[in-house]
Structure formats: C-alpha cells, structure tokens
C-alpha cells in the first residue's frame, strides 16, 4: 500500500443518508427549518447554557452535597448531556440512538487514529501542563487517579454525546459536513473560563474530534481521547492526590 492509498482510506468517511423523517421541515413565522436538525441545535445549546449557568441543576437537586465538586458536575452533565438528548432521540424523534454515535462504529480506524492522536498529543499536553496558567487551573487537588478517571469518563463521554453525537449526526443528515464546524460553537462556548491557550486550541481539537466521529460513526473514540487528554493534564499539572 502506498502513502496516498493509506491516506485515502483513513479519510474516507461513511455516507450519512437522511431518512424521510430527517428531511421533514417545520415552518416558524414563515421560516422553513429542518425539524430535527433545528431541534437538536436549540436543545444542545440550551443544555450547554444550563450547565454553564447552573440555573436549574444544582448539587442539592441531585442529592449531592453543595461541595461535591467534580463528581457533582459529572452527574449533572450525565443528566443534561446524556440522559436528556437520549430521551429526545427515543421518545421525541422515535429514532435509533446508534444513528447518533452510540455505537462502536469503524473500530479499527477509530482505535488506530486514537493511538496516533495519543502519540502526538502526549508530549504537547505534558509541556502545556508546566505552564503557570495550566498548573493553576489543573493542579488543584482533584482526587485519586481512579476517582479522576471515573469522574471525567462520566462527564466527558456525556459531553461528547450531546455535541458530537446527538447534535453532529442530526446536522450531518441535513447540512452535510458543515456540521463539523457548527458543533464547534457550543463546544468553544463551554470552554470559556479555562486557560486562554486551551480556549483557542479548542478550534483545532474540537474539529479533530468532530472529524473522528464523522469518520467512524461513533462518539467512543473521541470520548476516550478527550478523557485521556484531560486526565493526563491533571496528572502532569500535579492535581492527583496520592
């Protein structure tokens, strides 16, 4: 195999043909909108906003102490970012969740591309973790390594689903690959308040994760990559309690 053929195979994504229901529109004040895609975009944006403001969901509402910290946030995001869109897919859309990335997908390419990404990103993350802004943000005590992995796996896999699963695949079937850029907007919005270099890096990192989900048809590989990057950052910044 040549380099060109390997590249062509690695970047050849599957087709995402819309179903009859995907193609249905709704007219609002004379404006014709794609019903599912518009609903997914509005809901995903509203859920991110609720998470950022914590307007409706508080630790107390979840039965957790007010100082529950990262675990409270992870449980909240599981509810907002996983349970709510899953319920919408099943109950409102009456659709198969596998069409929205809840499957293994093309696992050979997913695993291979994930490993390649890990090799590239590991030295970059370790280098960034030594910077004062990153050490101040990620070096705060975050718990033991198993606690950190469990907490951020719950949180980040849920976040992957709402943006690069539910939203991405709903948009893909109506607006095509432009969806990979549209999902960047709420993703970047959710990172406001983090170190500035990380905020700008989400333009690249988020696009790569969206592309990976498009290529594999799954949120699994981007989710695992996201968890690895964040846990490595916390470890390298000194946030793990021994």
What are these regions (language model features)?
Residues 1-99, 234-242:
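N-terminal, membrane-interfacial amphipathic/helix-forming hydrophobic leader that caps
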Residues 37-42, 110-115, 145-149, 177-185, ...:
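Hydrophobic alpha-helical transmembrane segments
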Residues 45-54, 118-127, 184-193, 227-238:
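Aromatic-anchored segments of alpha-helical transmembrane domains
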Residues 59-75, 91-158, 169, 173:
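Juxtamembrane helix-loop-helix connectors linking adjacent transmembrane helices
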Residues 79-90, 151-157, 219-221:
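Hydrophobic cores of alpha-helical transmembrane segments in multi-pass inner/ER membrane proteins
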Residues 131-134, 189-197:
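Membrane-interface helix caps and helix-loop-helix hairpins in membrane proteins
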Residues 158-182, 211-218:
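Membrane-interface helix/loop boundary segments of multi-pass membrane proteins
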Residues 181, 190, 198-242:
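Functionally important transmembrane alpha-helices
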């Amino acid at each position: 195999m040549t380099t060109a053929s390997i590249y062509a195979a690695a970047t050849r994504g599957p087709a995402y043909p819309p179903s009859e229901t995907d193609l249905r529109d709704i007219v609002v004040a004379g404006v014709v909108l794609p019903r599912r895609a518009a609903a997914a975009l509005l809901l995903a944006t509203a859920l991110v906003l609720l998470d950022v403001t914590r307007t409706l969901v508080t630790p107390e509402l979840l039965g957790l102490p007010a100082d529950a910290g990262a675990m409270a946030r992870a449980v909240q995001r599981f509810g907002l970012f996983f349970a709510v869109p899953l319920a919408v897919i099943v109950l409102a859309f009456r659709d198969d969740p596998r069409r929205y990335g809840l499957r293994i997908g093309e696992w050979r390419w997913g695993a291979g591309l994930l490993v390649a990404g890990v090799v590239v990103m590991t030295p970059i993350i370790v280098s960034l973790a030594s910077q004062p802004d990153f050490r101040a943000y990620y070096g705060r005590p975050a718990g033991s390594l198993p606690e950190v992995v469990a907490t951020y796996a719950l949180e980040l896999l849920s976040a992957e689903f709402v943006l690069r699963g539910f939203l991405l695949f709903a948009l893909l079937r109506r607006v095509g690959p432009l969806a990979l850029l549209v999902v960047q907007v709420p993703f970047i919005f959710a990172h406001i308040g983090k170190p500035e270099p990380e905020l700008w890096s989400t333009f690249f990192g988020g696009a790569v994760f969206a592309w990976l989900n498009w290529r594999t048809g799954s949120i699994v590989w981007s989710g695992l990559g996201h968890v690895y990057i964040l846990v490595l950052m916390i470890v390298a910044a000194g946030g793990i309690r021994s």
